Amino acid sequence: MTDFSQIHKPVLLQECVDLVTPALHASDSVAVDCTLGLAGHTIAFLKAAPNATVIGIDRDEEALDKATARIAQEGLSARFVPVHAAFDQFDEVLRAQGVSRVQAVFMDLGLSSLQIDERERGFSYAHDAPLDMRMDTSQALTAREILATYDADRLAHIFKEYGEERFSKPIAKRIVQQRQSSPLETSSQLTALVDAVIPAARRGSGNPAKRVFQALRIEVNGELDKLRRTLPQIGLHLAVGGRLVVESYHSLEDRTVKNFMAQGLRVDAPADMPVIPPDMQPFFKALTKGAVKADAGEIAYNPRSASVRLRAVELTRPLPQRWVHAFELESQGSEDGVRGAHGHRRRTQARRG
């Protein structure tokens, strides 16, 4: 029997349980774990909410198999439904299960321990490995293919947009030059190339290649696009009183989650309206004050929690399709100056849960 506790430490586990399980008291409650991984959070949810069923989604078949086996070891299989899918197939997954509304949705947007620790997956710059970075190994696109085929402008764009890399253009130029003589095949080759480009005086903390690796991983797996598509789907399927709980690990993810939640926390009425009618009240109630971060004890126990940002909201009234459409349009444009469906700027709702 595998001791998964030695290889998998769920981040902010108790905080997530405390946020998710109050919505799971009814006997027919359904929660969705959009990022099952090795099921650390899901097992805790199942134990804390004995009347609930959890649908566990993961695009990594190996992780899904291991998680399913782990849940069986815990004797919890009767209330668990494993699904091999990407989380942007949320609507499709629920339709296939005959579910229209769910009481809780959880997302842990970080890499799973399995993905980080298996060197051949190529996610970590700490170990030499093939430049793969696929979460779903059945897909075709790999980091190696991106580095071998994207032109300099496209490479620079993803390094800047997804990695917030200041030296995106010179790094992209060097990659194109390098591949004319020999392709970049391994993580150590890429790390050495980036190390040679970034001046020592301009480096921040950590490995100089960390932003490039982040950008490649996001591009390979379409992470931000999938997240932007998924959040509105989740909103439409949450029951009133249902909760959305999200852990993110870099600023781009957190910004996307924060903006989605912030739109639902705003009052859809002019700032000078003295009494706010029910149909202009916020759609969400905040369950966290800003983002919850790991404390020193958590970080000492689980160093991978150092960058986590945990946000949670509760749905207070159903989201209309027009609101979801407005978010989709907004996410394609500026993230500032969010406006309501009536064309006026919406004011921030101060009440916190």
Swiss-Prot record:
Gene3D superfamilies: Putative methyltransferase TM0872, insert domain, Vaccinia Virus protein VP39. Keywords: Cytoplasm, Methyltransferase, rRNA processing, S-adenosyl-L-methionine, Transferase. Disulfide bonds: none annotated. It is an enzyme of class 2 (transferase). One of its GO terms (cellular component) is cytoplasm. One of its GO terms (biological process) is rRNA base methylation. Its main location: cytoplasm. Signal peptide: none annotated. InterPro entries: RsmH, SAM-dep_MeTrfase_MraW_recog, SAM-dependent_MTases_sf. Its EC number is 2.1.1.199. Residues 334-353 are annotated as: Disordered. Belongs to the methyltransferase superfamily. RsmH family. HAMAP family: 16SrRNA_methyltr_H. Specifically methylates the N4 position of cytidine in position 1402 (C1402) of 16S rRNA. PANTHER family: 12S RRNA N4-METHYLCYTIDINE METHYLTRANSFERASE, S-ADENOSYL-METHYLTRANSFERASE MRAW. This is Ribosomal RNA small subunit methyltransferase H. It comes from Bifidobacterium animalis subsp. lactis (strain AD011). The gene is rsmH.
